[in-house]
């Protein structure tokens, strides 16, 4: 029963403290439960932050970006290209080839072939004219290595500008529920000394000769279609968030019913970019401009910008938190990062505020994504942007006590032992029955940006004096608020 009462006291104290305003926090007093002989105290400590330029992020994402536009807040240009491979089902089949031959004087031909590029979000001026080119890959990019968003498929010779390619002009003004644009692959296609009517005819004739190439993704990628590199080659003003790229080809079939009658019909096949094969984003940011931006406003704010833009580094005052409390239990540690509104909030072209951010130890940032880890609420956490409530217009981590304790145990092990990084992420969930769980955390590859109030710890500016105790109390713009508990000494 005593354990139960102890847990009850701690929970109530945590909830009470979480709702405290700044004045209450600065009292820094203690609450005593005489029955259970437990002493619970609270305190707050200043936290410092700064912007760090990401340079590149792991490009393992099902979403692609295509286009080029200017960040209205910073003036920085962002350009997106992507590589996609296509998946084939083991049951793939082309309709009765004899009927297709009858429609094409004995030849197996596709009437039309195109890449259907589908997007679920657009940024910028949707009517801005854009131009894209699809290059057939020279060879499939390897699945046994990691690629970052600054990878150069041309330099690494995965693809060449001399490869066969197809271009398309488009805009993003499509107002239907299903948004897409097409890149037609209808010009002559040449391979191994043979000329085909179009890329679809190449696919169909290859299937007729080697159906075994279509049984697995590996065989298909290495013998038929190594994928496409989709590159923005013209236009500035918008970007599209691509959720699927399909290769679709149509054909006509003639079936003789009797001597005087022939049934004419149209058929088609498709290959999709799926999770079973690679989709890789290539992001071009003006890195030098980002570095200037990060340093120019360092005293005012920090940034969260995606894709592959700017993160916020946080230095936690671990030693101060634990000083004098080495033998106490650290029950809760809450920290909130307030957002600064844009100078022009009404600009329709402003990038969206990142919806979710990850807090992860700085030295574990790279391995977290490469090893496909999930936030464990011990050394890594996620927080969603809140526009209402107690912590309005902020990202709040309700309890990182486990992280503080883990850092204290590793005190001094490496220069980043007390540092974490805030990173915009995309959280993917799956639902089984009535339970929804996080299944994947990727870098956010959408166009998102926000400024956070900078955390400082100036002895002359970021402290006040408690009127009762006369002690200095942290009053900086970002504070970590903690609750300790211990048994009272007899």
Question: What residue spans do the PLM features occupy?
Answer:
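Secreted, disulfide-rich extracellular signaling modules
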Residues: 2-490
């Amino acid at each position: 029963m005593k354990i139960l009462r102890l847990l009850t006291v701690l929970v109530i104290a945590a909830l009470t403290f979480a709702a405290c305003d700044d004045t209450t926090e600065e009292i820094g007093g203690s609450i005593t439960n005489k029955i259970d002989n437990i002493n619970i105290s609270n305190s707050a400590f200043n936290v410092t932050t700064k912007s760090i330029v990401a340079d590149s992020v792991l490009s393992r994402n099902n979403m692609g970006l295509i286009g080029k536009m200017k960040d209205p807040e910073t003036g920085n240009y962002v350009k997106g290209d992507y590589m996609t491979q296509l998946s084939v089902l083991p049951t793939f089949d082309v309709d009765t080839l004899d009927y297709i031959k009858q429609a094409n004087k004995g030849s197996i031909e596709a009437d039309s072939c195109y890449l259907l590029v589908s997007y679920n979000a657009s940024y910028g001026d949707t009517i801005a004219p854009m131009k894209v080119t699809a290059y057939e890959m020279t060879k499939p990019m390897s699945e046994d290595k990691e690629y970052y968003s600054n990878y150069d498929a041309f330099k690494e010779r995965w693809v060449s500008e001399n490869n066969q390619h197809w271009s398309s002009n488009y805009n993003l003004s499509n107002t239907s529920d299903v948004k897409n644009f097409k890149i037609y692959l209808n010009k002559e296609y040449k391979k191994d000394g043979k000329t085909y009517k179009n890329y679809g005819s190449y696919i169909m004739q290859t299937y007729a000769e080697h159906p075994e190439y279509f049984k697995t993704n590996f065989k298909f990628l290495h013998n038929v279609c190594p994928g496409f590199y989709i590159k923005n080659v013209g236009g500035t003003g918008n970007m599209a968030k691509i959720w699927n790229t399909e290769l679709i080809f149509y054909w006509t079939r003639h079936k003789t019913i009797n001597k005087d009658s022939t049934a004419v019909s149209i058929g088609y096949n498709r290959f999709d970019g799926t999770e079973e094969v690679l989709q890789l984003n290539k992001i071009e940011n003006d890195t030098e401009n980002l570095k200037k931006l990060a340093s120019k406003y360092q005293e005012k704010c920090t940034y969260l910008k995606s894709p592959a833009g700017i993160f916020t580094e946080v230095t936690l005052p671990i030693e101060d938190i634990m000083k004098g409390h080495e033998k106490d239990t650290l029950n809760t540690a809450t920290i909130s990062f307030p957002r600064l509104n844009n100078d022009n909030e009404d600009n329709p072209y402003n990038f969206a505020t990142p919806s979710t951010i990850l807090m992860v130890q700085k030295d574990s940032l790279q391995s977290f994504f490469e090893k496909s880890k999930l936030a464990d609420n011990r050394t890594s956490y996620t927080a969603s942007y809140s526009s209402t409530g107690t912590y309005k217009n902020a990202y709040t981590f309700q309890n990182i006590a486990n992280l503080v304790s883990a850092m204290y145990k590793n005190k001094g092990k490496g220069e980043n032992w007390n540092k974490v990084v805030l990173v915009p992420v995309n959280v993917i969930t799956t639902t089984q029955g009535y339970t929804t769980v996080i299944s994947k955390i990727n870098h956010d590859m959408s166009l998102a940006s926000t400024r956070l109030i900078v955390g400082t710890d100036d002895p002359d500016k970021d402290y006040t004096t408690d009127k009762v105790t006369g002690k200095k109390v942290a009053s900086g713009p970002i504070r970590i608020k903690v609750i300790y508990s211990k048994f009272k000494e007899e």
